[in-house]
Amino acid sequence: MRGGDEHGAGSTSHVLDASVIDAGILDARATIDARRQDWTDLLQELIRIPSCFETEHAIVRRVCEYVTGLGLVADLVPMDEKLRGHAHAAKPISSVADRDNVVVRLRGRGGGRSLILNCHLDIQPEGDWAERTHPPFSGDIDAQTNTIYGRGAMDDKAGVAICLGLMRVIVEQNLQFDGDLIFQFVLEDEITGNGSLACLEAGHVADAAIILDGTRPDRAIDQHAGTLEFRLKLAGRAAATSVSHLGANAAELLSQMLEHLRDSFHRLNEAREPPWTEFPSPFQFVVHGMHADAPRFSLPVEASARCFVTFPPPFTIDSVRAFLATEGQEYAQARNHPHLPVFVWDGFATEPVSCASNTLRELVRCAARHNGIPAVRIGPSTGTSDMRHFARRGIPCVLYGPGRGFNPHRPDEHFLLDDLPFMMKIYLDITAEWCSVAHRDRSRRTI
């Protein structure tokens, strides 16, 4: 899908027969369209609430107010010290008090499959304001293109607005499915993923999950590359700057080694395997930071760097660590470095993950076709997400939505407001279908 008005224009895709769609769903779809301005106002309000790491309290309060205003119960799942001892919790573990995820369960009649809709409340820091044409927390709207600007507009305040709006429509239309529909509004997607982990550990599980994060209406993600963060330390040999040839400058040695490691790691892209061939470089090596220092007239004898890599299967965390360590040691030995490099494997690390089921993939495609999207490309991503926590519990999961947004993590992040009601209707169709099929009934019915 390209451009601004291609949701259904000229589409020859299969559109579901309205006669077999429950009248309540039709009314709900009409309500979604009729309240476009409400959804715009809601997203604008959410964008105007800064919610970076450890400062999410205000947006959590607002979500809880919205939920309780609908007569529902907001279950708070704390981000507390219990996470510190969890094997799959990532650092840093915050000590800031009263930080909570929000979970809302719409109970079904019974007998149907349950579904989680997961979105995240936290955002990336706003960055350098000088690089922007719109202030990061303004929620500025370009009326000509019906586009809203602001940090988190796509990632993931749009997902939050869609979940809250869908919740409101379901409640006010008195819709009830056979299975439970569970909304998870989580913290720390942008840094640790511990919010989704905490919700699942608290028992908020389901038969499938959709994470509203990172894609547009014609794209879904069913697997992720692995990631590995590490520190690299290198020691040199002391000497005065006036006779630097007698020493070994640790800063220079480390810079040269990092270039070698980057180039060696990137060469692995030449042998990448499908479906990762759709990316030019799923193997990525990024230097996040470097440090070296010395007195004025001396060479630095210690240097360190913080690095981050991504890697597709069949590589694993262990095989990537072995590759990097071998490359670093052989490079140092070949150049007669005074010391071998020291790798410190204490950073963020995730294995490649895939946990979608064919049933869930087909359901996403079917709901998209019903709404005029001829095809949804479902495939891998070189990024990472909270999918790994669902995979660990055997819960089928895809990332889908929240819609057409641009510049996440960059200046002038923005989102096309037409996709708020559009994606809301797709998730309504997905929910109606998934939650109305019994656990053991794997045959599909017509929506």
Where are each of the predicted segments found?
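Active-site metal-coordination/substrate-binding segment of hydrolases
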Residues: G85-H88, S95-V102, G111-I182
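Short beta-strand segments
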Residues: N118-H120, F185-V186, I210-D213, K233-A235, ...
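A structural signal for short hydrophobic beta-strand segments in well-ordered beta-sheet cores
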Residues: V104, G139-I141, V287, F390
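Metal-dependent amide/peptide-bond hydrolase catalytic core
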Residues: R2-A23, D27, A34, G69, ...
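Active-site catalytic microenvironments for nucleophilic, acid-base chemistry
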Residues: I49, L166-Q173, H260, S264, ...
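Acidic/histidine-rich catalytic neighborhood of metal-dependent amide-processing enzymes
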Residues: T147-E229, C435, H439-R445
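Hydrophobic/aromatic beta-strand patches that form the interior of the parallel beta-sheet core
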Residues: D75, L115-L117, A208-I210, H288, ...
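N-terminal helical capping/dimerization or prosegment-like subdomains
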Residues: R2, S13-I116, H120-G127, E302-F308, ...
